[in-house]
Amino acid sequence: MGRIHVLSEHVANKIAAGEVVERPASVVKELIENSLDAGAKRIRVHVEAGGKKLIHIVDDGIGMFRDDAMLAFERHATSKLKNPEDLLSISTLGFRGEALPSIASVARVRLETRANEEPSGTVLEIAGGKILKIEEAGLPLGTSIAIKDLFFNTPARKKFLKSESTELSHIASLVTHYALAHPEMHWELHSATNALLIAPPVATQSERIYQVFGNETLDQLIPLAAQIKLERIGLPKPPPWLRKNEDDEEEQTVEPGEVRLHGFISKPEIQKLNRNSIFVFVNGRLIRDRLVQHALTEAYRNILPPTLFPVVLLFLEMPYTEVDVNVHPSKTEVRFRQQSLVHDFVRDSVRAALSKARPIPQFISEIHAQPKASPSLTPGAQTAPAFALEAQEEPVLPERLQFGGDAISVEANAAVPVARFGAQTFGSHVAQQQTVPETSGCDYELPDLPAADAPLASLRPLGQIRESFILATSNEGLWIIDQHVAHERVLFEKVLKQRAAASVETQQLLMPLIVELTPGQQAVFTEIAEELHQNGFEVEPFGSRTFAVKAAPAGIRAEDIEKTLSEVLDSFEREQQAFNLEHAQSRIAATIACHAAIKVNMPLTQDKMEWLLAELAKTEHPMTCPHGRPIVLRYSVKDIQKAFKRI
């Protein structure tokens, strides 16, 4: 007896569901695209338990006839394609006929639909791929489809779903994408507890951006519009002896068309921790294409730090024959016929828009100095050589080194510049004040590294390099300490201890700070609201997706409170793991410490440097900051002796 057999249709549908239905957001995506293909002008999405318990989508599209409603749940049944040639120019969002049968095979489905020409509608109920009921009913024009108990018959798939807030944030992000792409439509997203998004139709995309992100984000966006002619490329003609007839010798000339790009890109002042705010559509289709992502990365190179991302809303439009959307089960990846042309066009168009707007990145700013903190580090007549442990000409030193003195002032909201510099040979004069980069976002990897054996408590601070790095000495050699990340480690462990003892220090705001959250951030906030409160944030609802911050952790400047809260929510929004309380506490503490810590380009007195080194020595892990960056560099006496050729 043979070993190979044909799978039953029921099993085949479950396998297909594994490709199409990855999570609740995948179901929402397929159903929304069906509604858009049906010409809907109003779409309402309601979910419960992050979509695990219920996904209910209602639209006012053209609806379906009774026979079509039944046929729609058959595999590869579609109204979008008829001939093989149609695959070469797909103009609809759906076309395979896989989504509905795949969803119905792993969930309980109730479909209510009525076409405009029909006096009554059709109600269809399916569970696990089996039709339970079909009947006529009086229904409004359009379609309503409810998906209950997703993966109820495949527990192995269900256990791999993330927390309710994580799944809800994915759904919120998806609906936000389509709401931005279709400002002419009415969109609603509701969870079991509140409304995450209500966006009435508007005339322009900028008005829709205002609805979703608020006026502050809109003011930081740059409009973009560009177009380019496509090149005429194709397969070479066959030689004359292989042509079927002489009439085919001259091929009909067809204009290749144009590629058009329009939308909005953000100035460098807006910096996100993840790519969730990058919205790219190709012919109205939401994509996550590596080619376009790389083009955007190249366009923002040397403008944004490599670990941070812009806000982007871009629409690529081109002939349907120039893009293949049938390359991935979820249809989020595409293949362009002229990849290099599309990549360079996107990159150069974004660069040109940034250059035309002449934005001044927030992390490049000047230091307005008073008298310098240390006479020995004041500008001199000679240019400072690069730092090296190689023998050089002996610099002219003052008779006596002094540290301390008056401090300089930094503007309250002056951001951190990005400028390369060479460190000094110890004791040389500094020719001019230069600035040092500081990471303006936080990468939330929290390694648990062992504490170093170095006797940090015995360090004696000598001064600062660029008012950003503390130079210290001990019997073991020369030490360089990054003052920002050192203080960050001190504050991180302090916040965790205060949280454990329920004695977190807070600061009451004179006036509540009004913060508007995105739908995805609001979904995360619902999950971690109590933990935020335990860490010093006092936040109350103040309308739809708007919250009033009345108190915040002590040490965070007033102008940084909104950014701190936003970074916390964004970091959880990109989280792929189930919610873990201990991990959440560490993540929130790390973000608070990052924003409350001493900054670079900040002068410190001798007492402050001694205090910081003493506090760092008391921490459990003094060698790395909470995000994994090194805190200290050490040059041993032996290394220095080797550099001077003494051993």
Swiss-Prot record:
Task: Give me the Gene Ontology terms describing cellular component.
Answer: mismatch repair complex
The residues forming a coiled coil are: none
Keywords (A to Z) from UniProt: DNA damage, DNA repair
Q: Which cysteines are joined by disulfide bonds?
A: none
**Entry's SUPFAM superfamilies?**
ATPase domain of HSP90 chaperone/DNA topoisomerase II/histidine kinase (SSF55874), DNA mismatch repair protein MutL (SSF118116), Ribosomal protein S5 domain 2-like (SSF54211)
GO biological process terms on file? mismatch repair
Q: Do the record's keywords include DNA repair?
A: yes
Q: Which InterPro entries match?
A: DNA_mismatch_repair_CS, DNA_mismatch_repair_MutL, DNA_mismatch_S5_2-like, HATPase_C_sf, MutL/Mlh/PMS, MutL/Mlh/Pms-like, MutL_C, MutL_C_dimsub
- One Pfam match, given by its short name, reads DNA_mis_repair
Q: Which SMART domains match?
A: DNA_mis_repair, MutL_C
Gene Ontology MF: a single term: ATP binding
Q: What does it do?
A: This protein is involved in the repair of mismatches in DNA. It is required for dam-dependent methyl-directed DNA mismatch repair. May act as a 'molecular matchmaker', a protein that promotes the formation of a stable complex between two or more DNA-binding proteins in an ATP-dependent manner without itself being part of a final effector complex.
What family is reported? Belongs to the DNA mismatch repair MutL/HexB family.
**Protein name listed in UniProt:** DNA mismatch repair protein MutL
**Organism name:** Koribacter versatilis (strain Ellin345)
